[in-house]
Amino acid sequence: MAEQAVSEPSVYAVEEYSVQEEPYYLPIADEIELFETAYEQRIPVLLKGPTGAGKTRFVEYMAYRLGRPMMKVSSQTGEEAEHRMPLITVACHEDLTASDLVGRYLLDTDGTKWVDGPLTRAVKVGAICYLDEVVEARKDTTVLI
């Protein structure tokens, strides 16, 4: 069986990843301005704190706040679609592999097909990718990040 790479469509259904309602978040200091500046400069952000400190809620709030409409164009059909800022959350654990994040080849009836992982999907659509509890991931997976 010959191996062939079949790429995913260039437009993903990202509506399921959009934060539709404004989450309640009470700023403590200048974290909103710092996050916005990092986002504008394309600098990754690491949030560190104990369980229940509000890291996940803050990322959800920022995804909503940065939720200006984004245009995506499908190279296959030329159709345009408008979406809010997607937020893709990955719950990290000790069994999480690099392939789980990036993607992998899978067999189907037509041969081999590449399926993007959440990190690759986030990069392709300009989403925020939140790796929850990244310290729980395997060392070989964190090297990828």
Predicted regions and their residues:
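AAA+ P-loop NTPase catalytic core and its hallmark functional loops
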Residues: 1-145
